[in-house]
Regions:
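N-terminal leader/targeting and accessory segments in enzymes
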Residues: 1-123, 127, 134, 353
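Nucleotide phosphate-binding/pyrophosphate-handling subdomain across enzymes
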Residues: 16-24, 36-44, 344-421
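Active-site flanking residues adjacent to catalytic metal/cofactor-binding acidic residues
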Residues: 28, 51, 181, 210, ...
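Phosphate-binding loop of NTP-binding sites
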Residues: 40-43, 86-89, 98, 102-265, ...
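Extended acidic/charged loop-beta regions that coordinate divalent cations
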Residues: 85-87, 144, 197-239, 274-347, ...
Length: 421
């Protein structure tokens, strides 16, 4: 395996005269994501310090074990308790854990001071995005190639199911797949394990499927996923973000400049994240509970003639062509091609229950198609997927009554759709 070079570099600035990639990092938070960032930085020769708002005596045995591993790997310093500005001395980048709200003290004041000192603030996903770019450059420098598809999933509800299902579909299509992010493991942990097991960069995963929370996205700046979806938006985590607009803006950062945007057309908040001007420049695919209304879209069709069956359908595009959705054109009159709806699978044939899961399945299909995978292979994986624990999981049927574990239903937006199964 080749050594990565400039893994922390901004790809846009890499060739600028005098540009130097950062090499002095302060990691905030001794959790899974913070530890992954610290390990990645140390692995790549950076100077690393760590700070956590908890007292050392409050750390769990697992956290103490992590701390020991980091100190053995070369961690320069670890601070516990209230953040103070002296921690910023010589720091070029702060790596912030998703558990730390930027609007709550002491984090808010600390980050404000960091910005005054022109210190960058990165999420773990920003480290990941730069690492993937560095791997591509390294492979190219050795006459190789590494350009994996990155499929990203966010939304208030349905992230884990859609992420896991997308990974399953891609695997059934014969690809090497890594699933990581909010779903666990941390993206950098999965990246490090993949690097450790690969003989060369070309042996790395073909496709990365990432579940991303608004917490992770807020300080992500250079991710340019192949395709990404926002499944839905309802009020959640407002104590962390401050208000609904800030929450939505964080979610919207999942779309890079070249990302295929996969949008829930039945959710006005989701559709409102893409302006009319942007729609003329972006590749967009929609999914929803209605029949598709444009080429390449996904939806649900109710067939009264067949006893009221709901079908997952796709406004089919030519499988022989590269499956990139068409960009919408403004101020150009184009005669619409007649839609050719292809019935994919009855909704009742899915092993995951409920209309909301039918929408999750459509989003997963759209993501996998955006990665260039043939529909017929994806449908085999769709039929097999049994869902994730605690998400409308059938436990037993006793005397005609079905008992369901939906203990992950912790907000109104999550519970409501289950009652309309």
């Amino acid at each position: 395996m080749h050594n990565l070079e400039n893994t922390f570099a901004n790809p846009i600035m890499l060739n600028d005269e005098g540009y130097q990639a950062p090499n002095n990092f302060l990691i905030l938070g001794l959790g899974e994501s913070g530890v992954a960032m610290a390990k990645w930085c140390l692995r790549n020769g950076a100077k690393v310090s760590l700070a956590d708002t908890r007292a050392r005596e409050q750390l769990s045995p697992r956290q103490l074990a992590w701390l020991g591993e980091l100190e053995f790997a070369g961690l320069q310093a670890a601070h516990f308790g209230v953040f103070n500005d002296s921690l910023l001395a010589n720091v070029e980048v702060i790596g912030i854990s998703p558990g730390l709200s930027p609007i709550q003290e002491p984090t808010q004041s600390f980050l404000a001071q960091a910005q005054k000192e022109v210190i960058d603030i990165w999420s773990e996903i920003e480290f990941f995005a730069r690492a993937i770019a560095a791997m591509g450059r390294t492979a190219k420098a050795h006459d190789g190639k590494y350009e994996p598809a990155i499929l990203a999933v966010t939304g208030t509800n349905g992230k884990t199911t859609t992420t896991a299902l997308t990974g399953r579909l891609c695997e059934r299509a014969g690809k090497k797949v890594a699933v990581a992010g909010n779903i666990s493991p941390a993206a950098l942990d999965r990246l490090m394990s993949a690097l450790d097991s690969a003989d060369q960069i070309e042996d790395m995963p073909d496709i990365w499927v990432l579940e991303l929370s608004s917490f992770q996205l807020l300080h992500t700046h250079s991710l340019n996923a192949t395709a990404a979806t926002i499944l839905n938006l309802t009020q959640d985590h407002l104590d962390w973000h401050g208000d609904m607009q800030a929450y939505a803006n964080a979610k919207a950062k999942i779309f890079g400049p070249n990302t295929i945007c996969i949008l829930n057309r039945n959710d006005p908040l989701v559709m409102g994240l893409i302006s009319e001007a942007q729609k003329t420049d972006r590749s967009i695919v929609t999914f929803g509970s209605s029949r598709p209304d444009e080429q390449g879209a996904f939806g649900i069709e109710h067939d009264l003639r067949a006893g009221g069956i709901d079908w997952l359908v796709w406004a089919e595009v030519d499988e022989e062509l590269e499956p990139q959705p068409k960009r919408r054109r403004k101020s150009v009159i184009v005669e619409d091609e007649p839609l050719r709806l292809k019935r994919l699978i009855p909704a009742d044939a899915l092993r995951i229950r409920g209309r909301h899961n039918a929408l999750n399945a459509l989003a997963a299909l759209a993501l996998a198609r955006a990665a260039g995978l043939p529909m017929n292979m994806l449908l085999h994986g769709l039929r097999d997927y049994q869902g994730e624990p605690h998400r409308v999981q059938s436990i037993a049927i006793i005397e005609g009554v079905e008992y369901v574990d939906d203990s992950k239903g912790t907000n109104v937006g999550r519970v409501g759709p289950r009652q309309n199964r």
